[in-house]
Amino acid sequence: MNKLIIALILLFFFLGQSVRGQEDNIKVSLMTCAPGTEIYALFGHTALRYEDKARGEDWVFNYGMFSFNTPHFIYRFVKGETDYELGVTRYPYFEGSYAMRGSSVYQQTLNLTISEKQELRRLLEENYLPENRVYRYNFFYDNCTTRARDVIERCIEGKVVYSEGKEGLSFRDIVHQYTKGHKWDELGIDMCLGSEADKPIDARKQMFAPFYLLEAAKKATIVVGDSVRPLILHEKKVVDAEPENVGDGFPLSPLACVFILIGITCFVGWLQFKTRKIIWIWDLLLFGVQGLAGCVITFLVLFSTHPTVGSNWLILLLNPIPLIYLPIMVCRAIKGKKDLYHTINVVYLTLFIMIMPFVQQKFNVTVLPLALCLLICSANHVLLYYRQNNKCCLLYTSD
């Protein structure tokens, strides 16, 4: 009888040690990578690391895999139909790639039970099945960071509770935090985002950005009944690096370029006023670029499934109308016919500039001077017509 009791005690002891050893051997971590210099890397990256020392496994699960070689990649990206997929790589390769590009990597070890770790592995393996690994990417709502957060929450038996995020932040505010020093990239993104991107968002929506998830995870807790434990056991920087500061690769900022355009437009207007002749090449360039940019924005507003782009008030300034009307304008001028385009454009652009402060959208700093540039160009034509006809009339006929 005593031998049986001793045997049972030893059995339970070794079973406990086995389970404890199994738990100690498995470690799951949230990996947050610092921003890189390429536009697709400006916001950083998130991945999951799964370590099982007993099996010699050390894998990184990455929901941010995509290929530029995908057929019609640019068109699909603009339309909001880009597909990303879950990729798996060995940790040393993952660490080395970020060290090579100069991006620091932070590791937050998750405070999970053995059953939760096993469930997380099962979910990741299920996600990695060929029929499950590909997903439709959404920059704000379904990306590599939100996917990592969601799969962590799914494996936890209780509930993850986050602290409140920063008040008053919008998607555009967070984007601007990551585009500092990259003014041309910031301009391109700003031109695409509409007024919806300027609405305040809650803590959960702020987690689309990798470092916002990192900060949220630090303060998060796991609640199971009356039990509360921190989500993160500990954090460390596994790659300490600084990216090469390459900036935009262009010496002039967008704002400087727009002011140069204003200067050239004023000079062209002076030449036209002095010679009483229209310099058409400048009109073709200025209104052509306005129309082409307008085609892109109109396409985004009407056809793209990207979030926040459908409410873009910038379409009032940048639309295809100048590009469509430009040939008509030139033909009417050559035939000596009257044309009200520039007169209407002066009134229209004046009204646009006046309503800008009241529109619930944060325009890029280049928008106002750009509108002024286009206004000056049209005003030059109106003044030239007045000079040519020597009377107070806001119609013009070209020579």
Regions of interest found by a model, annotated:
Residues 4-14:
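Sec-dependent N-terminal signal peptides
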Residues 19-23:
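Boundary at the C-terminal end of the N-terminal hydrophobic targeting segment
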Residues 24-103:
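Glycine-rich catalytic cores of cysteine/serine-nucleophile enzymes that process amide/ester linkages
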Residues 45, 58, 107-109, 145, ...:
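Extracellular structured ligand-interaction cores
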Residues 67-158:
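A cross-kingdom signal targeting lumenal/periplasmic-facing segments of multi-pass membrane
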Residues 126-394:
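Activation targets extended, charge/polar-rich intrinsically disordered C-terminal tails
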Residues 396-399:
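Conserved small/polar residues in nucleotide/adenosyl-binding loops
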